[in-house]
Structure formats: structure tokens, C-alpha cells
Amino acid sequence: MTIPDNSDRPGARIPCETRNVFGFSVAVSSVEEMSAALAERALEAEAPFLVAAADAHVVTLGVHDRDYGNVLERMDVICPDGMPVVWRLNRRLSSGEREACRVSGPDLMEALVRSNVRYPGLRHFLLGGDEKLLEALSGALKEKYPGFQLAGAYSPPFRPW
């Protein structure tokens, strides 16, 4: 799978406040705000965009592995999925600014799927896990959320740990 370079697409980035966390622009947002911003952008975008939910491991890996860091830098938005990242974000904020919230991948995904009611036509692509997990997840989402539309799913080959 090739990660597209979105830097030449004007407006590809998700409009939100960010702060630098070890060299990466991480969103200062809540799950609700981010899901609304992503849903609105998805409906107006002519191409897919990339969202990373970054915990401390992901950020640290991006710092120490330049190839991985380059992939992170090409994300349209990086959400703080882990309290150490949130704490670092909050240390970057000025006195009086609102505090950053954790925007975990699963919470964000569920909020986006729930938002299909407000944003009909929203489609979702599932990436990661094994094929059995993706099948079970897509089935559960279709059952729980009748408006859920699956654009596709991909289980990449993983290296052994």
C-alpha cells in the first residue's frame, strides 16, 4: 500500500488547531469536534484523506524511524490517542487556552459512524487487523448502525513481532 503525498493537495489538511509534539503537528480537539470536522471534510473532499491516532509509541517510533516519521508527516491530521501525547500537548498550550483531549482511534471511529445520521453519504475504509477481524467489525457496524457504508477494508501483511 502506498501512502499518498497529500502536500500538493490544497486544503487536504483537516482545519483544526495543532501543536508540535516532538516534531509532529497534533490536533488540539475533542472526539466530537474532530468527528464533525472529518465528516464535513469527507463529504466535500474529492480524494481520501489520512488520519492517524497517535499514542506515545507511534510518536516515538516516528521520531526514531525516519521512514515512519515521513509517513506520519503526510497525514492530514494526527489525533492524540494516548494520555502522554495529551499531556505533552497541554504543556504546549498557553495559559488560558483550552486543554487538549484524548481522541482515541476507536472513540473517533464510533463517533464518525454515529455521525452518518447527520452526514448521509459518509463512507468508511477499515485498515488494519486481520481479515477475520475486519469482517467481524464491518458486520457489527452494519448491524449496529444501519446507515453505515463501507468503502472498503484492507488487512496489510504484518511483520512478525
Language model: regions and residue ranges:
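N-terminal nucleotide/polyanion-binding subdomain common to many enzyme families
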Residues: 2-102, 109
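Conserved beta-alpha
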Residues: 11, 88-161
